[in-house]
């Protein structure tokens, strides 16, 4: 592949607390450790990877808007915004960038309010319950799909 693909990784609220926050559900890796591993993998795949985490919905929306015309694919763990944010859904629709929704835990095996996602039906794919490996699987899938379409 001649040109680098540009992939944006977005992480929502409370994911900055990974490593200490309910490790039995979310694992013991910190968000920095997950992103560092993913960055190493991205380099080996000739991918430019950017990461952004925020506990603020508007900041995630602003970053999605900034991605228009510069990002080829988005990997997003919307965390609690999965179940509440029509605004993030609308932002993703507005920029028309394909994305994969990621969840560390199996949201379908948890409380009923976590079973609904405002993003899943418009996502290129959804990965849940595979822990930090889900980010790697999402990256590999995004690169494969981008390679097939370019």
Swiss-Prot record:
InterPro entries: DHquinase_II, DHquinase_II_CS, DHquinase_II_sf
GO biological process: amino acid biosynthetic process; aromatic amino acid family biosynthetic process; chorismate biosynthetic process; quinate catabolic process
Keywords: Amino-acid biosynthesis, Aromatic amino acid biosynthesis, Lyase
Parts forming coiled coils: none
Top enzyme class: lyase
EC number: 4.2.1.10
Domain of life: Bacteria
Residues bound to substrate: 77, 83, 90, 104-105, 114
GO molecular function: 3-dehydroquinate dehydratase activity
Purpose of the protein: Catalyzes a trans-dehydration via an enolate intermediate.
Name of the protein in its database record: 3-dehydroquinate dehydratase
Organism: Enterobacter sp. (strain 638)
Gene name of the encoded protein: aroQ
